[in-house]
């Protein structure tokens, strides 16, 4: 855990606001969504929100260099949000290592791309959202279910949380 996180944005539609954004951060170790944020405007500030959530949840603060000595890499694509000075400065401030996906190589960020495909199929293709508030609630419910109940072949048929907890128990027994 805490070696590589992926992040990306995904657009979806609401009747009231039109196109909106979901930004997510995923843990490559177990596919757990560590942070997510919905917004009408998909700018660098919206893209930073789930990164901050993930850092605060896992390391307890947003202090300067809070993850510097961990060796944690953040892998975004080359979207303008991620290439912006504000985004770059914030991840440097937090101590995250920047590891961008290769240009025109979505498989480089395949973990988050796969999650976005899943949420597209399970949420965005099924629901017609009235507004961003309704979308945020339904997306949040799905992410909660995904983290705790979504069975993934790659994780030996466990959910992301179950895999993390099972791995921590195994590591403690070995130690």
Name what the model sees in each region:
Residues 73-78, 92-111, 128-132:
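RNase H-like polynucleotidyl transferase catalytic core
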Residues 1-26, 32, 48-53, 57-64, ...:
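Mobile-element integrase/transposase regions
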Residues 51, 63-84, 102, 158-161:
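Acidic/histidine-rich, metal-coordinating catalytic segments
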Residues 8, 27, 77, 109, ...:
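Acidic active-site catalytic centers that drive phospho-/nucleotidyl reactions
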Residues 27-28, 38-45:
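A short acidic/small-residue loop/turn micro-motif
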Residues 32-36, 98-101, 125-126:
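Short small-residue beta-strand/loop micro-motif enriched in glycine and branched aliphatics
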Residues 22, 43, 47, 75, ...:
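Hydrophobic (often cysteine-bearing) scaffold residues that line and stabilize catalytic clefts
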Residues 85, 92-96, 118-175:
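C-terminal domain-tail junction helix/linker
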């Amino acid at each position: 855990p805490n070696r590589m996180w992926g992040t990306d944005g995904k657009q979806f539609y609401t009747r009231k606001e039109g196109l909106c954004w979901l930004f997510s951060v995923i843990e490559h170790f177990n596919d757990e969504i560590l942070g997510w944020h919905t917004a009408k405007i998909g700018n660098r500030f919206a893209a930073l929100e789930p990164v901050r959530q993930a850092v605060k949840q896992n390391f307890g603060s947003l202090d300067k260099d809070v993850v510097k000595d961990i060796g944690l890499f953040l892998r975004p694509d080359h979207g303008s949000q991620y290439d912006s000075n504000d985004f770059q400065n914030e991840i440097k401030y937090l101590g995250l290592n920047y590891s961008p996906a290769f240009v025109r190589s979505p498989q480089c960020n395949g973990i988050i791309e796969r999650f976005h495909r899943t949420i597209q199929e399970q949420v965005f293709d099924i629901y017609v959202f009235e507004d961003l508030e309704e979308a945020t609630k339904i997306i949040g419910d799905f992410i909660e279910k995904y983290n705790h109940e979504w069975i993934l072949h790659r994780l030996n048929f466990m959910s992301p949380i179950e895999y993390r907890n099972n791995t921590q128990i195994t590591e403690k027994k070995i130690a």
